[in-house]
């Protein structure tokens, strides 16, 4: 592989790095050492692969969406079915790996942040599996939006802490989880949920999620005899996208498209389009594109989908954009809801609202491509968690 990042200081070009208090520096360095060692440890890799296959249910299918393709009227659309994983999303690819890493480091407790609740559920799941004590921080707004996932986490034995500070969403949950980690660093591992945070987290999460792209690349070659012409994924922090993109990074013929949440529209204040509208800053221990005002205060991100409303983006995505290796687009709430319904009706698949952003852009892109071309879209999660929210929204529209 010719592309190599991060450098030894955890930078992807000018993005990334390690901006943490002294109290955490020892912990992130210890984590980095343990992680690098685990990569060449056959016993660790064997155990990881065992749980991915037998517990998570990998590999996931690469499904030819025939009716969706016909609807778009262009390139063949293949769906990488991460919604079929145990717990219903891509998040568990990463939590399994990090829980095994925590165990290797002798840490019996884990802490995590969650927005939509998917990462919280995936963390609580592996904590139950490996008999670890688990604390999850979740913004008060998200606790309301995703009450079912809160109950799921509690069923799995986790303690869910509702965060009432700031905008009471994902950003604030990360702040509190980091504070908790600082106070309990000796016996606790922080399971970061996306390609964010101080080095080595973006690298660790990318590598554990790369199973998505590794499988998709192999499966597409088997089905089509060539690589896809384009790959598409939604981007909040950006872990499902990075998991799909990274194994294709040296395949210059494969266009990579990340899709952010445009909320009510980029011209409004209600969006989460960090790459389109952000400026470079430091958030949660790394240099990244951040939504901020002229005084450098972090703005609230907004999206119908709780998993996309993060005001930053993984540093490697910003690096890909600067290199011209990936293009980033945005899709509004209304477009995502339309795509959600479209996939339900054409393929009988209920996607997560996060993934619906990718579907929306993919259909537009496919329609401009030739029938002999093909694309892979990451269906990052299933939509059970969103059905209630959607029901209220659609009923609200019919009652207006």
From Swiss-Prot:
Stretches assigned to coiled coil: none
EC id: 4.2.1.20
Pathway(s) it belongs to: Amino-acid biosynthesis; L-tryptophan biosynthesis; L-tryptophan from chorismate: step 5/5
Sample GO molecular function, one term: tryptophan synthase activity
Catalytic activity: (1S,2R)-1-C-(indol-3-yl)glycerol 3-phosphate + L-serine = D-glyceraldehyde 3-phosphate + L-tryptophan + H2O
Stretches that traverse the bilayer: none
GO CC annotation terms, alphabetical: cytoplasm
Cofactor dependency: pyridoxal 5'-phosphate
Keyword tags: Amino-acid biosynthesis, Aromatic amino acid biosynthesis, Lyase, Pyridoxal phosphate, Tryptophan biosynthesis
Family (UniProt): Belongs to the TrpB family.
Role, per record: The beta subunit is responsible for the synthesis of L-tryptophan from indole and L-serine.
Subunit-level organization: Tetramer of two alpha and two beta chains.
Protein name as it appears in the record: Tryptophan synthase beta chain
């Amino acid at each position: 592989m010719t592309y190599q990042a991060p450098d030894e200081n955890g930078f992807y070009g000018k993005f990334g790095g390690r901006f943490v208090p002294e109290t955490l520096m020892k912990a992130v360095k210890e984590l980095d050492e343990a992680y690098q060692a685990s990569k060449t440890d056959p016993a660790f890799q064997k155990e990881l692969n065992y749980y991915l296959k037998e517990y998570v249910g990998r590999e996931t299918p690469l499904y030819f969406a025939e009716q969706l393709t016909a609807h778009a009227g262009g390139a063949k659309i293949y769906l990488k079915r991460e919604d079929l994983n145990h717990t219903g999303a891509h998040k568990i690819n990463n939590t399994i790996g990090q829980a095994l890493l925590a165990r290797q480091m002798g840490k019996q407790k884990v802490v995590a942040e969650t927005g939509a609740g998917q990462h919280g559920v995936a963390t609580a799941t592996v904590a139950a599996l490996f008999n670890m004590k688990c604390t999850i921080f979740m913004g008060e707004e998200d606790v309301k939006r995703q009450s079912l996932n809160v109950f799921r986490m509690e069923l799995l034995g986790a303690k869910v802490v509702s965060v009432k500070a700031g905008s009471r969403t994902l950003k604030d949950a990360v702040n509190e989880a980091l504070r908790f980690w600082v106070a309990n660093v000796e016996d606790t591992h922080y399971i970061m949920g996306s390609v964010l945070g101080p080095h080595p987290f973006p690298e660790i999460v990318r590598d554990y999620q790369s199973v998505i792209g590794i499988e998709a690349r192999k499966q597409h070659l088997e089905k089509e005899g060539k690589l896809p012409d384009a790959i598409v994924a939604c981007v909040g922090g950006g872990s499902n996208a990075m998991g799909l993109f990274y194994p294709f990074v040296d395949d210059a013929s494969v266009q990579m498209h990340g899709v952010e949440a445009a909320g009510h529209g980029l011209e409004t204040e209600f969006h989460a389009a960090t790459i389109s509208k952000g400026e470079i800053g430091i958030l949660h221990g790394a240099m990244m594109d951040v939504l901020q005002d002229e005084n450098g205060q972090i703005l609230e991100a907004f999206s119908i989908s709780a998993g996309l409303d993060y005001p930053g983006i993984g540093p490697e995505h910003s690096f890909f954009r600067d290199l011209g290796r990936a293009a980033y687009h945005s899709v509004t709430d209304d477009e995502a809801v339309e795509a959600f319904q479209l996939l339900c009706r054409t393929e009988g698949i209920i996607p997560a609202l996060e993934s619906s952003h990718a579907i929306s852009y993919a259909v537009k892109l496919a329609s401009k491509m030739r029938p002999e071309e093909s694309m892979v879209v990451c269906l990052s999660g299933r939509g059970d968690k969103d059905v209630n929210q959607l029901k209220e929204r659609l009923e609200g529209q019919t009652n207006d």
